Amino acid sequence: VAELETIDEERAGSTESCCSPAAQKTCCEPEAKGECCGPGREAGNCGCGVGEVTATVPEDAAELRDTVRDRYAKAALAAGSGSVTCCDDAAQLTEGQRELFGSSLYDSDDREALPEAAQLASLGCGNPTAVAALNEGETVLDLGSGGGIDVLLSARRVGPTGKAYGLDMTDEMLELARRNQAEAGVENVEFLKGTIEDVPLPDDAVEVIISNCVINLSSDKPAVFREAARVLTPGGRFAVSDVVADEDMDEVTRDDMGQWTGCIAGALTRADYRARLEAAGFDQLEIQETHRVHEHAASAIIRARVAP
């Protein structure tokens, strides 16, 4: 694996977020009610954002998947309504996190071409469409397509003779993505319901796979990579943005459900990413870190190829 030099820039977030003192006063005062102000979320500890301990990671894979699905269903509903909820860490990013995740990581020209709801629903850690080197006429699959931001951008790049598939397991995200597709007026797109561990496409169906901060959420990553290799044509390209963990990530972080749904706890180390991709039949692996997202993790671009 070519591990290129880490770009670790300082990113300062706005203090005017759902966890600002003003928000805490109205949302997390003792008499406040509702999900965002439940036990343990007193003033000064709203529970906003990635990293707040609310539960441990379940051992049951189905339960873990349901928890992830619930978080992203909330995110879809929030993005679709254009609303910002106070201290709902399950569905919103703070302003500081928006510097590390979401649509701020895309060029302004790309953002301007997309519906606002697609931008609001973006919870990714990079811009895989910028590094996938998509060509006119290619077929591309986005694993965990969410509100459709990367699918819509990919559809523009492959043109009318190409096609972009989006795969997601969350009904609310699929509904939002299809609305965004209609608003954007893009026709060479199809959104599919399913999981990234069991892709509902035939063998050799696509030439490129992209994904944006999703593979870390899976409890069965070897299955994800096997399915990616299966649906890619021989020589097909794998170009994803994902979080990679440092070797020294502690067990407390690994066992925190909030850190898992926040794309940290389930992240593979660089060595694990390489080993599991190679086991699935990929070669020409490259990992390029882009920015730090946690004390023990970074966002990275991972590129590979299915051996011809």
Task: Walk through the language-model features, giving the residues of each.
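N-terminal auxiliary segments of SAM/dcSAM-dependent transferases
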Residues: 45-103
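Short, glycine-/aromatic-enriched active-site segment of Class I SAM-dependent methyltransferases
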Residues: 245-264
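Short alpha-helix
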Residues: 265-280
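Class I SAM-dependent methyltransferase SAM/SAH-binding core
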Residues: 125-128, 135-198, 223
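A short glycine-rich, Lys/Arg-flanked "PGG" loop and its adjoining helix->strand segment in the class I
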Residues: 222-237
